[in-house]
Amino acid sequence: MIKCKPCLIIVASIFLSFTPSPNQETPAFCGIRNTSFKSGERVIMKIYYSTLGAYIGAGEASFTTTLDRFNGKPVYHAVGEGKTYSFFDNFFQVRDRYESYIDTSTLLPYKFIRNVDEGGHKIYNNVSFNQVAHTATSTNGVFKITNCMQDVVSAVYYARNIDFSKYKINDKIPFDMFLDDEIYHLYIRYLGREKIKTRYGKFNAIKFKPLLIKGTIFEGGEKMNAWISDDPNHLLLRVESPISVGKIIVDMMGYSNLRYPLTSLISVR
């Protein structure tokens, strides 16, 4: 079971928190194309613990994309890094780095690297994907995978390219992800469009829910909400989830080199 800590970089691992559904069919999103981001994009997210209306900064995450080559093929090298602030380091220090080498045409990953230190618990895993032979070779062995397999980081960029106009409210959008040498059959539930106020400002946004795993610090079920910008960037704006006391809020607080103007922004806070 995938564990999530209060100060873990929830942004990078938002798609780790879904409940696996082993009987779900393979998703039909092979062949998706990138229409939302470009090389050079950088996004800063801040993690807050909120209780009684107060916001306490707990950590920070960054996502960057650069153009690279992998085995002679053009790829997006996407990196997600996160850390807790010094005050929270005294309780639970987090230093995480996730990397993915993503095919520029198919948005499928060739390689995924996870190098994390969470409260002194260190994990390193290096996974190479063969999307044609349907295998994933990790630090621990070779595993069979399904079509159009995603990793943690590539899943974030994949989700930004979903065409939500094709869906009705409460539709489930499935995809497969490989993590910790296991395949997870995941989905998000589309909840429509609305205005959202964050610590950055006010936006027109698209809202959806992941289904959380029971037994983590989060409540089981569809308690987590996420919002992306209702413009061609589909930029992640906010993630919000209740915990046993208070809630965790992750807000986009900075960006550069977006592919399109952030037209969803109504006003800056």
Q: Where do the model's predicted regions map?
A:
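Acidic, serine/threonine-rich low-complexity disordered tracts
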Residues: 21-129, 167-269
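Hydrophobic h-region of N-terminal signal peptides that target proteins for export
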Residues: 11-20
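Bacterial N-terminal signal peptides that target proteins for export
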Residues: 1-8
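Hydrophobic, well-structured mid-protein blocks that either form specific transmembrane helices
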Residues: 121-163
